[in-house]
């Protein structure tokens, strides 16, 4: 049964996200993916997969520039083992993370929260429901694209499960530890450090996300433990009061330290909070009430412009029933409800408010609603899957009815979110024959794939990264001068970006081109999202050099032209 449920969930997820993607080589044509693809190519070329150095790709003058490298390292390993293109490795890895980490992880967390007799029905339900919402995993494959965060969120259920084991070992009132794990301390000793290391390498902020999800659990468990001692051990009441006072004092000190850090780190004396977090990802896209409705109805933003999934009414109704029953009957899983309300509130603030308070509370996630909404299934799945067997306990076939209900809910949810998720993936991963708004189209991709025959090995390709030339490494095995759309570039890179139209008249241009190993330029009139981004202006001289015929055309594909620089030859 469990194998069948896992298989159904994996197949459903694969169909949801890839049924509208016409080829396994197609990739997300989004801003962030340029970095992710080229970072993986950099690892393959240099052998350096260190988190301490990965961002030197866009900050080449820095000795240390940290960026979580777990995703890129895994993708590079897949390429080395299979000899497949990086783009196929990314798509395969996305499916593997969902199948091997997220789905089993959230099912394991759910099983940890129920007694052994209910474990099969709970696990089966969680396996099915793991892919039944649009919040995660699908949305992070469309928005961004946020591959490191996608990997990091998949690890959070396992981290929360380890917290559950830890609390069971330190809180005797909870009990039932060894019937689910016969060696809990060994599990903590081995899996705990490995999880922290893995989460840090996947994305360090996932540690904060896991803490935010587990915070209500810690408070809930601590309160239950102190309340039990207060009732059963009157002689300890004075000590309990001191413990509570210490916790409150520690909270005040921690809050003060955080306020001081924010004030100093973000230079609030000269730049108010309102001037921070003003990028696209931080702008409110919903009203407060609209965002609340999304949390309640499980209507997820997909990541594609103006596209959300339809409300999951059956699952939303069952979720509300489960939450109400858990709170009214004071179940040990009540913390899941409070955690859902807590994370949901953060999402509402990120999606529906531009206030200073919203920025402070959600700044750890860049006020990005997608990073926060991805945490909701971590709580929805365990809450529903652990409560249904208890609600069905008095029926004739409690386990079968609970599992069957989960199956119906999962199937109806898959059918509901399929059109929106499919459309979002189609729009984001499409490779049109000719288009001026995507990063690369079919004509340019064809030219990029000819680069190995046209550009000698060891030569870099220069171009405006906003028009697809930044993908020369991924599609043409030739390193681009600009491996991302923006960065803290070297003086030579800035010279060729801003003064290429002075070829033949400014010796500094040829000197910079020589040091960068550049004699080939790829030009195209296209631009991601149709152009207009101020960051693209610094590359305008590259287009002017082509317009002024300062370079020799070598190969043309539609409006895309590969040029050779002859004016710098001695």
Mark where each language-model region is.
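Membrane-interface alpha helices of multi-pass inner-membrane proteins
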Residues: 179-182, 186-204
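Hydrophobic, aromatic-rich transmembrane alpha-helices
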Residues: 297-300, 310-337
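Extracytoplasmic
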Residues: 414-570
């Amino acid at each position: 049964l469990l194998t069948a449920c896992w298989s159904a969930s994996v197949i459903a997820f694969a169909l949801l996200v890839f049924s509208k993607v016409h080829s396994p080589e197609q990739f997300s044509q989004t801003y962030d993916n340029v970095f992710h693809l080229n970072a993986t190519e950099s690892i393959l070329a240099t052998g350096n997969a260190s988190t301490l150095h990965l961002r030197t790709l866009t900050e080449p003058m820095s000795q240390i520039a940290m960026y979580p490298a777990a995703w890129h390292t895994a993708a590079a390993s897949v390429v080395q083992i299979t000899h497949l293109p990086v783009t196929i490795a990314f798509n395969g890895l996305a499916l593997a993370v969902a199948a091997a980490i997220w789905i089993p992880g959230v099912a394991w967390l759910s099983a940890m929260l129920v007694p052994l007799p209910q474990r099969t029905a709970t696990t089966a339900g969680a396996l099915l429901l793991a892919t039944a919402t649009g919040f995660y995993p699908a949305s992070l494959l469309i928005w961004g694209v946020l591959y490191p965060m996608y990997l990091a969120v998949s690890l959070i259920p396992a981290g929360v499960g380890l917290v559950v084991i830890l609390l069971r070992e330190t809180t005797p009132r909870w009990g039932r530890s060894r019937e689910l794990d016969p060696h809990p301390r060994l599990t903590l000793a081995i899996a705990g450090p490995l999880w922290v290391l893995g989460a840090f390498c996947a994305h360090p902020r996932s540690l904060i996300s896991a803490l935010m999800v587990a915070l209500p659990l810690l408070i809930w468990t601590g309160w239950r433990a102190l309340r039990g001692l207060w009732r059963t051990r009157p002689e300890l009441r004075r000590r309990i009061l001191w413990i509570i006072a210490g916790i409150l004092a520690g909270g005040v000190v921690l809050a003060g330290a955080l306020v001081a850090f924010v004030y100093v780190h973000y230079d609030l004396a000269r730049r108010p909070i309102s001037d921070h977090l003003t990028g696209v990802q931080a702008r409110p896209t919903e009203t407060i009430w609209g965002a609340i409705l999304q949390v309640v109805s499980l209507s997820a933003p997909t990541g594609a412009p103006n596209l959300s999934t339809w409300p999951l009414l059956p699952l939303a109704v069952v979720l509300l029933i489960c939450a109400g029953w858990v709170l009214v009957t004071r179940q040990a899983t009540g913390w899941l409800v409070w955690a859902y309300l807590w994370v949901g509130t953060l999402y509402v603030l990120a999606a529906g408010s531009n206030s200073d308070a919203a920025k402070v509370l959600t700044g750890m996630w860049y006020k990005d609603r997608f990073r926060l909404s991805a945490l909701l299934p971590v709580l929805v799945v365990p809450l529903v899957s652990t409560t249904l067997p208890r609600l069905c306990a008095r029926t004739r076939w409690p386990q079968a009815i609970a599992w069957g209900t989960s199956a119906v809910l999962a199937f109806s949810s898959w059918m509901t979110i399929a059109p929106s998720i499919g459309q979002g993936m189609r729009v984001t991963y499409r490779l049109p024959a000719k288009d001026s708004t995507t990063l690369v189209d079919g004509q340019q991709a064809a030219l990029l794939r000819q680069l190995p025959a046209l550009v000698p090995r060891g030569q870099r390709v220069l171009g405006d990264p906003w028009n697809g030339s930044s993908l020369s490494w991924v599609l043409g095995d030739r390193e681009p001068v600009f491996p991302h759309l923006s960065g803290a570039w070297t003086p030579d890179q800035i010279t060729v970006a801003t003064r290429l139209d002075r070829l033949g008249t400014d010796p500094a241009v040829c000197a910079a081109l020589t040091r960068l190993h550049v004699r080939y330029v790829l030009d195209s009139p296209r631009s991601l999202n149709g152009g207009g981004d101020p960051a693209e202006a610094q590359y305008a001289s590259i287009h002017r050099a082509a317009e002024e015929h300062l370079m020799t055309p070598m190969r043309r594909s539609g409006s895309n032209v590969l040029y050779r620089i002859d004016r710098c030859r001695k």
